């Protein structure tokens, strides 16, 4: 996760840092909301370009660089706060480009993913997400206006109908699968290090959310490997695997290289790790559970809870031996509060079948 400020030096440095990250085979996300909108003035008296225009340059760079020298292109996430004056332009950007793609395809151009003509279309190399606040959702529920604020002064430049704006997000997501929505207040309510800084953005796929200028080692366990011949889920072996993987990942931070000095310092100080699982859909199918069913959600919840509990337990055991991460002391109270939230969520979960009961009892 990177950061960018409202200066040309910072914007150009964003381009450079992303390029180095893509070269190394990783992806990056950042929040552009500090950049002045196209409705605000520059010191010189002109009008600012706005974040969407700067997205164009970053998008072109990402489309040019092969990630780690491989065949796939770079992975990007771009986030904009819902109260940014350019939010409507941000929401509609990809919709307009999708219309170009269809028109060019129908005219005979090669617009397949990776096709030779797709490079003429902009904004195709990033996932876009809107940071939605509780204040905005309250305005949506009440059917009232919502203020869009200047980045330089914080004053409300204009208001917009919250329901119409939310509708635009939904229609854009239907048309081109973007933007996604990130619920800012909820995300920061589960933040373990708020005394250090807030969470403003995520990695390209949004499974990692943490401090600006930070990174996270990611690992996934293949759930199908833990499906036993009798149809039950091997929770005990899964737990041991999660325990081993999280230990190895923590050790790897000590030996890893990072793309910038700021990311190196934050990652070494906070030691962010991300462990998850893959093949949930296959596991549910093999178990005879619909993806959108109470049984499916219960099994997924049980596995997630087990994985979270075991890995946090192992993290505490490691801290007892080598000491907590450097940033823990100033965030101890908040970290403990989030742990209690996890415990509360797990204790309030309900079992549906023997499949998830076996996992819960592990």
Residue ranges and their predicted role:
Residues 224-230, 285-292:
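Short helix-capping/linker segments at secondary-structure and domain boundaries
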Residues 246-252, 266-288:
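Core structural elements
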Residues 295:
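Ferredoxin-type iron-sulfur electron-transfer modules in oxidoreductases and energy-metabolism complexes
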Residues 28-32, 180, 279, 284, ...:
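Short, flexible micro-motifs
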């Amino acid at each position: 996760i990177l950061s960018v400020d409202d200066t040309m030096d910072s914007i150009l440095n964003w381009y450079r840092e992303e390029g180095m990250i893509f070269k190394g085979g990783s992806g990056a996300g950042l929040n552009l909301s500090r950049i002045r909108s196209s409705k605000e003035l520059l010191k010189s008296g002109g009008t600012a370009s706005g974040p969407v225009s700067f997205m164009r340059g970053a998008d072109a760079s990402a489309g040019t660089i092969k990630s780690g020298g491989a065949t796939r292109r770079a992975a990007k996430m771009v986030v904009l706060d819902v109260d940014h004056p350019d939010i409507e332009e941000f929401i509609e950007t990809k919709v307009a480009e999708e219309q170009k793609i269809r028109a060019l395809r129908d005219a005979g151009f090669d617009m397949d993913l990776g096709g030779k003509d797709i490079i003429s279309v902009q904004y195709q190399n990033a996932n876009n997400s809107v940071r939605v606040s509780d204040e905005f959702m309250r305005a949506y529920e009440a059917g009232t206006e919502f203020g869009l604020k200047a980045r330089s002064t914080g004053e409300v430049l204009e208001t917009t109908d919250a329901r119409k704006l939310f509708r635009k997000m939904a229609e854009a997501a239907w048309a081109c699968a973007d933007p996604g929505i990130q619920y800012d207040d909820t995300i920061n309510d589960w933040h373990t290090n708020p005394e250090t800084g807030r969470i403003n953005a995520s990695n390209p796929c949004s499974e990692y959310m943490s401090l600006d200028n930070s990174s996270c080692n990611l690992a996934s366990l293949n759930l199908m490997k833990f499906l036993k011949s009798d149809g039950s889920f091997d929770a005990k072996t899964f737990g041991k695997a999660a325990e081993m993987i999280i230990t190895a990942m923590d050790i790897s931070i000590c030996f890893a290289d990072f793309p910038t000095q700021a990311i190196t310092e934050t990652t070494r100080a906070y030691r962010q790790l991300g462990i998850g699982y893959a093949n949930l859909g296959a596991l549910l199918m093999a178990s005879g559970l619909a993806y959108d069913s109470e049984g499916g959600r219960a099994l997924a919840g049980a596995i997630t809870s087990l994985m979270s509990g075991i890995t946090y337990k192992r993290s505490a055991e490691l801290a007892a031996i080598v000491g907590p991460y450097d940033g823990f002391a100033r965030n101890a109270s908040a970290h403990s509060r989030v742990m209690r939230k996890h415990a509360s969520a797990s204790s309030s979960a309900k079992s549906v079948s023997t499949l998830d009961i076996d996992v819960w009892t592990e």
